[in-house]
């Protein structure tokens, strides 16, 4: 609530350019994944004040790099949701954030200590449910990406659960429609294999025409 009333700057992950534009500013980073962590580590040198908030607890792993097993399980959950036509869960909710040396150092010096999500945004800052207020000049929304499917409405592919049933990269309702980067392909463990799969499927489909 109040997002439109904020008088400072707001950017999403895809609009973020670099940390230098936040020199001397009080910056709020919103999100609980690796993008939020990366922004905080980069902004630390330039921002006058940094605040990190997340809707959920951030799961810092004991591993120093992404655990392939956890990544595979997260992708499997994406695949299950895509096959059922449900809204897709985030990858990081299943993988957690690896505790690299740089990230551990950020934790040790108090930088990577997320606060709970604020209750509302005000023109010059944010306020929590207990009344605590913090002035903010800029907000970086590192909240991930949602599949943008509205432009596909004329194809009538969406299910009542809110998603599109996708199996092996193609629509269950219309196998001629392929979804590269959707569901289990939107992965932090690498999309090359999925990209090759889609390419082979497209070629096979075209060869039948």
Predicted regions and their residues:
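Flavin (primarily FAD) cofactor-binding/catalytic cores of flavoenzymes
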Residues: 1-209
């Amino acid at each position: 609530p109040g997002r439109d009333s904020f008088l400072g700057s707001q950017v999403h992950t895809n609009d973020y350019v670099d940390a230098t534009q936040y020199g001397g500013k009080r910056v709020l980073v919103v999100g609980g994944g690796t993008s939020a962590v990366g922004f905080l580590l980069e902004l630390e040198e330039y921002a006058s004040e940094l605040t990190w908030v997340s809707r959920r607890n951030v799961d810092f792993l004991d591993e120093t790099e992404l655990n392939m097993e956890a990544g595979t399980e997260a992708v499997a959950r994406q695949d299950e949701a895509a096959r059922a036509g449900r809204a897709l869960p985030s990858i990081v909710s299943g993988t957690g954030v690896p505790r690299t040396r740089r990230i551990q150092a950020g934790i040790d010096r108090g930088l990577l200590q997320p606060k709970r999500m604020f209750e509302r945004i005000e023109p010059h800052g944010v306020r929590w449910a207990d009344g605590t207020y913090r002035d903010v000049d800029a907000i970086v929304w590192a909240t991930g990406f949602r599949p943008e499917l509205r432009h596909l409405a004329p194809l009538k592919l969406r299910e009542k659960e809110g998603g599109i049933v996708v199996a092996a990269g193609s629509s269950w309702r219309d196998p001629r429609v392929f979804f590269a980067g959707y569901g289990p392909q939107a992965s932090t463990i690498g999309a090359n294999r999925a990209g090759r799969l889609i390419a082979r499927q497209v070629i096979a489909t075209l060869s039948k025409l």
